[in-house]
Amino acid sequence: MEKEVDKKFVWVIKDLNVFYPKQSHSDPFLIAGSRWRLLALPKGTNYEFFYQYMGVADSCQSLTSSWRRHVKLRLTIVNGISHKRSIVTDSDLYFDENLPACSYPTVPPPFNLLARDAGFLICREITIVIEVVSLEVIGTSNNDGANSIDLLKQTQQIIDVNGFQVLPSQVESVKRIFEIYPNIASEVPSMKPCLKTLYMNVLLGIIETLCQLPAELSDTDLDEASIAVLFVSQGGFKVDWLEKKLKEVKEKKKNVDNGKARLQQIEEDLQKLNQKRLDLKDILDKEKANDLTANVPLSFNDVLKMF
């Protein structure tokens, strides 16, 4: 029986074999009347996670008239040591009546997912939380038999840019990418639109990360960006330029961190010098007071005074 997702769906992957990962999947869950589940597919000694769309639920067959959904899901790979180390990924998914069963890859998990000291694998279990961030209904039921492609053109919620379906807010960024790197997707193999959209969202997410101040980026942010670049590259995108930019940002981050360390050392040295200055001033004031006390002439009576 599918679970209707209100805010969160928790999947605990149990009895994981670190040396021989095996494919597994969550129980089905419902989002906006559609059936989904999460797949964990082994890749080497790690896992890749996929959202799998499984069609309209039996109890919601009224959705089979022309309709389209846009749902934003947040996947969190929980870290048992520190919440700050948890891996959080947002994905924009689009599905409609005519879309067959389709798997949407998420950003690959951290390289140390199964490491004993990383905090993700606790008692041979990994916990994944799926949250519905937003849900948008694009179009409504009608009787004219209009298919989802016509409905998409009418609502203009998604725009095609060089074969990629993107949101209106992403159009200028995607166009700019293709203007500067027209061959970026020339070797991308034929794939379903949902997968192409996922890859483009990951690419835009990497660029957004690199546009932040180096001082605001953590090492984890940059590690995740490296994994994401590899993910996009494996999808057939030519992202040598992005790898160079990532390397450049990492170098800037290193320089900023080193600069912070030097500044901190200088501030500590300055604080010590200031304290030494204050200590010397106290000594100087005491010496001046002693000097004033000693530098007093004897009076006539003082000279005549007997001991």
UniProtKB/Swiss-Prot annotation:
Entry keyword annotation includes Ribosomal protein: no
Keywords: Coiled coil
Top-level taxon: Eukaryota
Record has Cell membrane as a keyword: no
Domain spans labelled MATH: 6-132
Residue ranges the record marks as coiled coil: 238-290
The protein, known as: MATH domain and coiled-coil domain-containing protein At3g58380
Species annotation: Arabidopsis thaliana (Mouse-ear cress)
